[in-house]
A protein has these predicted regions:
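Low-complexity, polar-biased intrinsically disordered regions enriched in Pro/Ser/Thr/Gly
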Residues: 172-174
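Extended serine/threonine-enriched, polar tracts that run as long, contiguous segments within proteins
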Residues: 187-197
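Elongated alpha-helical scaffolds that mediate protein-protein interactions in large eukaryotic proteins
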Residues: 1-148, 159-167, 176-189
Length: 197
C-alpha cells in the first residue's frame, strides 16, 4: 500500500498506476486493504481527486485518472473497512460528488453508483454526508439549489440521446459512451442510477 500512496503523494502517479490500484483493491486480501486504509489511503485518493478536479480544464489524461480513481474508490468501498473509512472523510464524498458533473458520462455514472451506495451504507449518516457533498458542489459551481449543477449535467446527457435510442443525432459524449467497451456504462443505466440517488 505504501508504494501506491507514495506515488500519489509525490505526484508521479500515472493512469496505469491508478488502474493497478483499483485491481489490487478489488482482488487483494482484506489485510492489504486494511493496511491501505490505515496508511490514510482514502485521504490520499480524495486529495488527489479534488486536486484533479480543481486544476481548471481537464485534459484526456486527467479525465482518465478521475475515472480510475473512482474505480479505486468503488473497489475500496466494497469492503467494510473501506466503506466505514469513507464516512470518516467527508472530503472523499465531496470529491466523488464533484464527479457527478464530470465531462465524461462514464465517470458521472461511476460517481452516482458510489454515492448511492454511501447513502445506504450507514443510515442516516451516509445520506447526510452525501447531501453535504452536494451542498459543496453547489458552492463550487455557484448555483442556488443543492441539486442544480448535478441536474444540469443529467439533463444535458438525456438531451444528448440520439433519435429513437440510436446514435443518429446523439451528442459526442453519448456517442463516445455507447461506442466504448463498457456496455454497463450506457445512458439508460446512468439515468436509472441518478433516479435512485
Amino acid at each position: 500500500p505504501e508504494w501506491f500512496i507514495k506515488k500519489f503523494m509525490d505526484n508521479s502517479v500515472t493512469t496505469k498506476h491508478i488502474e493497478s490500484l483499483a485491481v489490487t483493491l478489488r482482488t487483494c486480501a482484506i489485510g492489504w486493504l486494511q493496511s491501505f486504509v490505515e496508511a490514510k489511503g482514502t485521504h490520499v485518493l480524495s486529495s488527489y481527486l479534488i486536486a484533479l478536479q480543481t486544476r481548471g480544464s481537464m485534459n484526456e489524461q486527467d479525465l482518465a485518472q478521475e475515472y480510475e480513481v473512482l474505480k479505486a474508490f468503488r473497489s475500496l468501498f466494497n469492503s467494510k473497512p473501506g466503506a466505514h473509512d469513507a464516512l470518516q472523510h467527508p472530503k472523499c464524498i465531496t470529491g466523488i460528488s464533484r464527479s457527478l458533473v464530470s465531462q465524461q458520462l462514464s465517470t458521472r455514472k461511476q460517481a452516482a453508483d458510489i454515492l448511492l451506495f454511501l447513502c445506504h451504507w450507514e443510515k442516516p449518516r451516509g445520506h447526510s454526508l452525501v447531501l453535504q457533498g452536494l451542498d459543496e458542489l453547489r458552492v463550487a459551481f455557484d448555483r442556488h439549489g443543492r441539486f442544480d449543477a448535478w441536474f444540469t449535467a443529467l439533463e444535458a446527457a438525456i438531451d444528448g440521446r440520439g433519435r429513437m435510442g440510436s446514435l443518429v443525432g446523439a451528442s459526442d459524449e453519448v456517442r463516445r459512451l455507447q461506442m466504448s467497451a463498457m456496455p454497463e456504462a450506457g445512458l439508460p443505466e446512468y439515468v436509472v442510477n441518478n433516479m435512485f440517488l
